[in-house]
Amino acid sequence: MNFEHTDDRRMLADTLVRALRDGYPIETRNAGAYGETGYDPAVWQQLSELGIVSALFDEAAGGFGGSGFDIMVVFEALGRALVVEPFLGALMAGRALAKAGEHDETLAGIVSGETIAAFAYDDGMTPVTATESGDGWMLSGTKAVVSQAGAASVFVVTVEQDGDPLVLLVPADTAGISVRSFNVVEGGAAGDVTFENVTLGADARVGGDGQGQAIVDAAVGAGLLALSAEAVGAMEFVKEATLGYLRDRKQFGVPIGKFQALQHRMATVLLEIEQAHSAVINAASAFDGDDAKARERALAAAKYTIGRTGALVAEETIQLHGGIGMTWEYAVSHYAKRLVMIDHQLGDEDYHLQRYIALG
């Protein structure tokens, strides 16, 4: 099996890494991440114009990529720079629409970066319900911690029903929708989206009868792969930063990297990162396959591995830096927070371990 990237994919990765290295230092990232909107619209526009969102979708959806390895390459680069712009929402909402083969105008806006989309998946304390109203539906309830909910102009909303989930495309300015926005601990913004007797027409539905679960699986599967790849990119950054610190920081007249105890701890970190990277490569390979069960198992394995490894890498790299690793000004502290919080998106390591076993 050949896991080497194509020339086009290498070019995409090089372009994105270079753009982020030159134009997205940690100070720029933090200014947007901890600001009112949780991201920088100018950065989003710049990266969209480079075709980064388009790389996440195939030609049928208006993009030029869309494979599992395309998603992996893009999100590894985004994770390495700790990007907070709303790529995950674009990927998941866009994948749902593309899987259904509907709402082409909205999908085109998402792929071009002109439309900010959010995938409203996890229910809050008041689960979202949809009751039939005429030819359409009436939505009530709350979706919790929806990434970039305040900036989104459109939501793709999932509603659990007996037999098959209902998926709906809902403009953010629809009467009855309210968003309580907030910054999240690792940087970026999210919001609780409340639907109060929101009336939708029949054209709001994404997909037909019996298609709901496949649409949700397509969106969530892409999200799991993206988060796992993002974590690998973040781990690669903190690995390099920590190795540099061990070489430069001196104690008793020698670099602390000469101390065997620290060498052993760093060696463990390196091995765990390689194992996590392998799990993500396996998931990216299975993502485009015809075997749905193998794909879901590979995604569950990757997300489980990322959750376990991400926490270890965050803790160890902070410990190896000492006090400076916790400071706001030092980038590693922000990466550590993100690595811990990735585990809690779309199911944590315990959930995905149980899921992997169940799929076996």
Residue spans for each PLM region:
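Residue-level signal for inorganic ion chemistry
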Residues: 20, 74, 119, 157, ...
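A short, Trp-centered hydrophobic/proline-enriched beta-strand micro-motif
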Residues: 112-123, 157
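Alpha-helical interface subdomain recognition
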Residues: 1-81, 136, 218-360
